[in-house]
C-alpha cells in the first residue's frame, strides 16, 4: 500500500510517497514558488535529484507536476497513479471539532473553511491543496491530519484563558496548541525505546525548530502544551516572541503609533532570537556569533534556553514528575550545546547526561546515563510517517 503525504504552504508544497509495507519513503519532494516566477519542483529518489522547472500558476498545477514526477518513466517510483491508495494531508487547524484524523468529505471541507478564521495563514493553502488533489484524484480517498488534534485532550482548566467566557463561546478563543503530530510521534517512539506502554509514562516532548513548542504527555494524552490560540505563544522562537505581557502590544499601538499589521510583523517575524541577537533566526549563525563574543547573540541563546528550561520545570509540576524528556526538530535534534544548556539546572530531577552520547547529531539515541532518574532522548521527528499511518488506518475502516 502506497500513500501520498501532502503538506501545502502558501507558495510551496512538500510531499512524500510512502510504502506502508516497509514504512519507507519511496520519493520525497518539494515544490517552491507556486504562483510566482521561477517555480521549481525537486524530487529525491534514492538520493538522486529530479528537477522540473516550469510555470505553476496554482497548487492544482503543482500537484499535476508532482503526480507527473512520481510516474515519470526514468525518475519516478510508480508506473501508474492508481498505485496511490490514499492521500494524507497535513492540516494545521481542526478547531474543537476534530480530536483525531478524519476521512475528507464535503462536510469536513466546510468545517475546514470554518476554521480559517483561527488559522488565516495556514488553513487556506491546506484547503487549496486538498481541493486540487480531490479534483485530480476524485476516486482516491483523502484524510486530514490536524496539528491541533493531539491537544484536544487538554483539560478545560488548561485550555481556558482568563478572559470573558463569551469570547470562548462565541469566537472559539482558547488554547489549541500545535505541532501535535510531532509530539504524538516522538512520545510514542520514546515509550518504545523504554520498552513501556506510553499510558504508563509521564513524558515531556520538546519540538525545537524555528517554531518551537513543548508538550506534557500523561497516560498517552497531551495534557499541556506551550503554544496557544496561535503558534505565536509559549517559548521564544526563531522570529516569534512567545509569551510576553499583552499590554506591550497596546503600548506599541498607542505610544509608538504602530498599526495592527506593523505590530503583527514585529511579534511574528522580527522577534525571538532574531530580534534579540540582531544576527539571524538561524541558531547556527547565532551560536557562531556568540562564540566570537557577540553579547546579544549570547543573550538570545540564554533567553531561549531559559524559556525551554522554565517550561520543562513547569510541566514536571503539571505531570507530578517526569519519566522521560524528548528533544526533536532542527535544533532539538542537532544542537548538543542547546540540549546541554537547557538541561543545565534540572539536576534536581535526577537527570544525568552522557556527554559523549549528547554529541551525536540528528540520530535516534538515548543521551542520559544508565543511572539517570529521568531518561533523555533525541528522536528525529517524522510527521509524514505519522500522517501516512493515520491515513492507512482510517481508509482501512
UniProtKB/Swiss-Prot annotation:
SUPFAM superfamilies: Actin-like ATPase domain (SSF53067). Its cofactor is Mg(2+); Mn(2+). ATP binds at residues 14, 207-211, 282-284, 330-334. One of its GO terms (cellular component) is cytoplasm. The record marks 179, 240 as: Transition state stabilizer. Its EC number is 2.7.2.1. It is found in: Cytoplasm. Substrate binds at residue 90. The active site is at residue 147. GO terms for molecular function: acetate kinase activity; ATP binding; magnesium ion binding. Belongs to the acetokinase family. HAMAP family: Acetate_kinase (MF_00020). Catalyzes the formation of acetyl phosphate from acetate and ATP. Can also catalyze the reverse reaction. Homodimer. This is Acetate kinase. It comes from Clostridium botulinum (strain Loch Maree / Type A3).
